[in-house]
Amino acid sequence: MSKSRIIRDVCSLLEGQLAIMQAAATEARHNATGEETRSEGKYDTRAIEASYLAGAQSAQAENIAAAIGILKVFEPLPCQEEEPVRSGTLVEAEHEGTIIFYLLAPDGGGSTVEHEGFDCTVLTPESSLYQSLLGAHLGDLLEDSSLLILGVS
């Protein structure tokens, strides 16, 4: 499976999350302005709380939409095994006997999809593991995470 396929799978995953978040934000907006949240006294804050929730959910939906947009135009360069890990690299690693793949990408961090029967997790620059992997080479052992790099592409 190519990196472009992983990115497409991550975009599909995020699009599903976006649909759920947009529906939740719409419902929260309705709850904030609906008859059922009309204030019944000066200490009744249901409408205010619902409006805060609607705002936060709308912001989260915008973040997910932005991530999808960034990933759809992201074209990672090929990486040879002798090259150091950089943005766009697909890293195969072993951690305590478990094989896992990481794709270093500009957005979509934390998303996990299947790659060759294993989990592939997207790491972004905000991640400490992303920062630890940058510049590492095939065969390196990352001391702080006990992660052995088995392959890069």
What residue spans do the PLM features occupy?
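Mixed-charge, polar/low-complexity N-terminal
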Residues: 1, 7, 29, 36, ...
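Non-DNA-binding regulatory cores of transcription-related proteins
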Residues: 80-147, 153
